Regions:
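N-terminal export and membrane-targeting signals
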Residues: 1-18
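C-terminal region of N-terminal signal peptides and the immediate post-cleavage residues
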Residues: 3-6, 22-41
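Low-complexity, acidic Ser/Thr/Pro/Gly-rich terminal tails and inter-domain linkers that flank the onset
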Residues: 32-55, 175
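Short, surface-exposed binding/anchoring microloops in extracellular/periplasmic proteins
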Residues: 46-84
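Short aromatic-acidic-glycine turn motif
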Residues: 81-94, 138-140
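Intrinsically disordered, low-complexity Pro/Gly/Ser/Thr-rich segments with frequent PxxP/GP/PP motifs
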Residues: 87, 93-120
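Terminal connector regions
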Residues: 118-166, 170-177
């Protein structure tokens, strides 16, 4: 009977040890995994204004977002954008409400195109800054950040005449912003 009891005990110990090891592997794999479809926070990206060129009185630029090292997140196809200063200049989005999201990770980029006119010096205004509201405040790791991304406007004056006083914004696009 002693042999039978020892075999049962050994089998029970091995069963419990195997279950514990399997549970450890499963929870370790789950804890290390991050969601891949998580909206970006301002802390997960660097942002900058990129000059895109000029022609026939029009100006082009972009707001470029680059994922920080080790970060993966998704930017919606349309993001809320506002101007600081230049009270007669409006923003108008050409992005469809259902524009596709763009995933960025580990140094990859996405941008929002901007277009405006800069003719008529007596009726021009220069914004102080442009702000974008990130879609998320808390990262998958639990880090929180202010959702507002404020970029100083360094792209010169914008037409503020009533007939042409709008900066048009486009949908979030994968890749680096085009430059001249």
């Amino acid at each position: 009977m002693t042999t039978r009891t020892n075999v049962r005990r050994s089998a029970a110990v091995l069963l419990v040890a195997g279950a514990a090891a399997g549970a450890t592997v499963l929870t370790a794999g789950t804890a290390g995994a991050m969601p891949t479809d998580f909206h970006c926070t301002s802390g997960q990206v660097t942002s900058r204004l990129v000059y895109g060129g000029a022609g026939a009185g029009g100006r082009d630029a972009a707001i470029q977002f680059t994922a920080r090292s080790g970060e993966t997140c998704t930017l919606p196809g349309a993001l809320p954008i506002d101007l600081v200063g230049a009270h007669d200049v409006m923003l108008s989005s050409d992005a469809a409400p259902d524009a596709p999201s763009v995933e960025i990770s580990d140094g990859s980029s996405a941008y929002i195109p901007l277009h405006w006119t800069a003719i008529g010096s007596p009726q021009q205004q220069t914004p102080l800054a442009i702000t974008v509201t990130a879609p998320q405040e808390t990262s998958p790791r639990g880090d929180t950040s202010d959702p507002r991304i404020t970029l100083p406007w360094n792209l010169g004056a914008v037409n503020a005449a009533p007939e042409s006083h709008t900066i048009r914004t486009g949908a979030t696009t994968a890749g680096t912003a085009p430059t001249v």
